[in-house]
């Protein structure tokens, strides 16, 4: 029989930026088990001459083809394995040589597919040259190693990968192409620009909005790829609505994001890691705030990309501010915002204190941030905290700490990886306004941490569909109704939910935690 070969291509292969890294890295093990080494991931080679901690090069892998690709096709690639569960084969491609040919490439894309790259700026050139290079790599590999009898699928993720998929549609039509959009660039932009996305979705014209928002190139590649590939998919019904209205093409299939549970520790290891994470967060609070917070403190957190409105960071802060005046709150609250900003260095004064075993009784200056930012006076989180008068005073029942860096275990302050920290939370809050799927609340419940999300997140809608009603706190996921205009109500419901959680007896919390984990189990791909 013929061989099945899958090519999975994304900007976030061996390159951690956001949720798509999670999508790819957590399904690699399942794909490896099903197809062994017939699955190849293709990513950008940003690390020339430097060590990429996510990539282990192996010069024996595909050695003959690599030499052929370089000599005959002028393609410089490195082959190795991705350091994640499943350890799939990865091809990293050096796409910089294509920059000199970009006008010619864009010209062909216009002639063949009406992709309009005329107004390109920012990351468009870089993403498109990588995408095109990846398409050339697949063509080269296919012609060297395979025949027409071999079934090959090429899956491209997001607009950044569209050009490669279109190149293959024309150059090697026998390769089946799938394009998966995890959001629409125009939908995300409308939402982030304070325009009402949902009530008026039917009235927006994608092409017109692209002009208005100066996003014509990204929108064009996304739309034309959706229309021209063999199969177009997206991650949730809520995003499929955007595809219909803004790309003028519904998805052929809605493929919800699956999930691996390998990185969720079990049994005693889980308990030990949770204890360590809580101790680290409470110790950080002491060193930064000069206060001793009890083991009984309710730790809540949010995390994700720094999209202040879209991710609901604004409404999270609003709710925490209202919580300070809530008479029903039964515990002290320590709230974290783990969102990478324009981060500079870890604070030296805080690093010094963290070296000490002493219990501190005086706060540091700015006792609400762990690393200095390059834009301390123009940061949305800090601006809103200042506007609301949130200063972490000793009298306040709610303390907020902003950790504005990637939690990779080497941040200089907490020095814990994200997954080793998230399980220390008691409750997580993801009140998104724009969230096509919602990995962060899903990761939270996988770590037995109940979560608050909204019905504008694909994940929130999915949980509601499981329950046949709005999911409540007792179910492990509280889904709040959110619309274009009910910001204040959402803030109140978050406040009330945290307050309600603070009064739950221990045995009820155990049940809620179990219910949360059970929801995640339904999405495990293994």
State what each model feature region is.
Residues 2-526:
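Catalytic cores of nucleotide-sugar-dependent glycosyltransferases that transfer UDP/GDP/TDP-activated
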């Amino acid at each position: 029989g013929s061989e099945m070969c899958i090519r999975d291509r994304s900007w976030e292969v061996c390159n951690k930026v956001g949720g798509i890294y999670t999508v790819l890295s957590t399904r690699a093990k399942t794909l490896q088990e099903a197809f062994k080494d017939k699955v190849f991931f293709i990513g950008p080679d940003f690390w020339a001459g430097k060590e990429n901690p996510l990539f282990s090069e192996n010069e024996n892998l595909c050695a003959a083809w690599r030499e052929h690709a370089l000599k005959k096709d002028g393609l410089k690639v490195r082959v190795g394995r991705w350091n994640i569960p499943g350890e799939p084969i990865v091809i990293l491609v050096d796409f910089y040589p294509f920059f000199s040919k970009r006008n010619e490439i864009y010209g062909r894309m216009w002639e063949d597919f009406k992709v309009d790259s005329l107004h390109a700026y920012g990351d468009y050139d870089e993403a498109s040259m990588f995408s095109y290079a990846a398409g050339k790599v697949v063509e080269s590999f296919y012609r060297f190693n395979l025949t027409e009898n071999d079934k090959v699928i090429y899956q491209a993720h997001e607009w950044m990968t569209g050009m490669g998929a279109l190149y293959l549609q024309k150059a090697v039509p026998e390769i089946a192409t799938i394009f998966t959009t995890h959001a629409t660039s125009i939908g995300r932009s409308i939402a982030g620009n304070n325009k009402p996305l949902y009530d008026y979705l039917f009235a927006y014209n994608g092409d017109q909005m692209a002009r208005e928002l100066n996003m014509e190139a990204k929108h064009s590649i996304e739309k034309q790829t959706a229309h021209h590939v063999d199969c177009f998919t997206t991650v949730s019904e809520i995003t499929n609505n955007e595809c219909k209205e803004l790309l003028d093409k519904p998805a052929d299939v809605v493929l919800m994001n699956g999930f691996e549970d390998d990185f969720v520790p079990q049994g005693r290891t889980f308990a030990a890691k949770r204890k360590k994470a809580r101790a680290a967060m409470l110790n950080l609070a002491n060193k930064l705030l000069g206060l001793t917070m009890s083991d009984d403190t309710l730790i809540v957190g949010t995390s994700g990309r720094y999209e202040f409105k879209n991710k609901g960071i604004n409404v999270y802060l609003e709710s925490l501010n209202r919580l300070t005046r809530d008479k029903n709150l039964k515990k002290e609250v320590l709230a974290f915002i783990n969102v990478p900003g324009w981060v500079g260095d870890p604070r030296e004064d805080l690093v010094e204190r963290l070296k000490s075993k002493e219990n501190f009784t005086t706060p540091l200056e700015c006792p609400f941030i762990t690393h200095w930012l390059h834009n301390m006076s123009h940061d949305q989180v800090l601006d809103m905290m200042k506007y609301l008068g949130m200063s972490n005073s000793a009298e306040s029942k709610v303390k907020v700490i902003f950790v504005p860096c990637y939690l990779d275990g080497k941040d200089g302050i907490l020095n814990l990886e994200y997954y080793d920290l998230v399980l220390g939370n008691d409750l997580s809050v993801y009140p998104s306004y724009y969230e096509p799927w919602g990995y962060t609340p899903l990761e939270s419940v996988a770590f037995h941490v109940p979560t608050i999300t909204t019905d504008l997140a694909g994940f929130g809608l999915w949980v509601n569909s499981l329950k046949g009603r709005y999911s409540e706190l007792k179910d492990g996921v509280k889904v709040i109704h959110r619309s274009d205009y009910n910001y204040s109500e959402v803030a109140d419901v978050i406040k009330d939910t945290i307050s309600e959680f603070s009064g739950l007896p221990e045995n009820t919390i155990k049940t809620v935690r179990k219910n949360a984990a059970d929801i995640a189990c339904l999405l495990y791909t293994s």
